């Protein structure tokens, strides 16, 4: 199926190939993508009344569908209706939370090309209205996941826009971000980090 942006440009997503090699570090979580881990984590939070967080659906306009059989419709062409914002949003302890989740195979830095200008602007707007906003970043080869406050991400994005570095060094993410250990249930307990960073005085 061909997905296209409103201007007609073809979408080539930055999702990892489904046939990728499994992660080597943790046998229980081997082969899971960041999105799958977060979806399972958010389901765990909802079932236990900890937080209500969902992945936002991407609005798509279906243009052409083939019907070889009535029960086997195949979408052949579709367009994104509008640029999406961030991946996840919800409520924790009465506060709105909004975040983007990205992963990279790079071991030493996180490429800023994984983000888009409209996502950064959205994060700025969420912060301006008092929401909690951050990015969950995974170094998939190292099987390490971090929570980085949107303030640091936006600062790096603005530096890049002014001609600066096009990635965030891993050592900087380790310094300003917060490591999220992988577990069984929940898989990525980012709410524990949110509690420490945004609610503990």
From Swiss-Prot:
It is found in: Cytoplasm. Its EC number is 3.1.21.10. It catalyses: Endonucleolytic cleavage at a junction such as a reciprocal single-stranded crossover between two homologous DNA duplexes (Holliday junction). The record marks 102 as: Transition state stabilizer. GO terms for molecular function: endonuclease activity; magnesium ion binding; nucleic acid binding. Keywords: Cytoplasm, DNA damage, DNA recombination, DNA repair, Endonuclease, Hydrolase, Magnesium, Metal-binding, Nuclease. Binds 1 Mg(2+) ion per subunit. Pfam families: RecU (PF03838). The keyword ATP-binding does not apply. Mg(2+) binds at residues 85, 87, 100, 119. Belongs to the RecU family. NCBIfam families: PRK02234.1-2, PRK02234.1-5, recU. Endonuclease that resolves Holliday junction intermediates in genetic recombination. Cleaves mobile four-strand junctions by introducing symmetrical nicks in paired strands. Promotes annealing of linear ssDNA with homologous dsDNA. Required for DNA repair, homologous recombination and chromosome segregation. HAMAP family: RecU. This is Holliday junction resolvase RecU. It comes from Geobacillus thermodenitrificans (strain NG80-2).
């Amino acid at each position: 199926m061909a997905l296209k942006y409103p201007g007609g440009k073809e979408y080539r997503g930055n999702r990892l190939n489904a046939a990728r090699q499994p992660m080597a570090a943790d046998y229980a979580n081997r082969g899971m993508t960041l999105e799958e881990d977060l979806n399972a984590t958010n389901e765990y939070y909802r079932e236990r009344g900890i937080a209500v967080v969902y992945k936002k659906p991407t609005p798509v306009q279906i243009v052409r569908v083939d019907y070889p059989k009535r029960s086997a419709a195949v979408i052949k062409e579709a367009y994104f209706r509008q640029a999406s914002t961030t991946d996840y949003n919800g409520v924790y302890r009465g506060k709105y939370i909004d975040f983007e989740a990205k992963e990279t195979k790079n071991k030493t830095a996180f490429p800023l090309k994984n983000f888009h200008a409209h996502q950064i602007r959205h994060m700025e707007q969420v912060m301006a209205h008092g929401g909690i906003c951050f990015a969950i970043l995974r170094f998939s080869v190292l099987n390490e996941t971090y929570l980085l406050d949107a303030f640091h991400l936006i600062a790096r994005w603005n530096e890049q826009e002014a001609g600066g570095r096009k990635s965030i060094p891993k050592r900087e993410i380790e310094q300003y971000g917060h490591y999220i250990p992988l577990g069984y249930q929940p898989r990525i307990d980012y709410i524990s980090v949110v509690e420490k960073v945004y609610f503990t005085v």
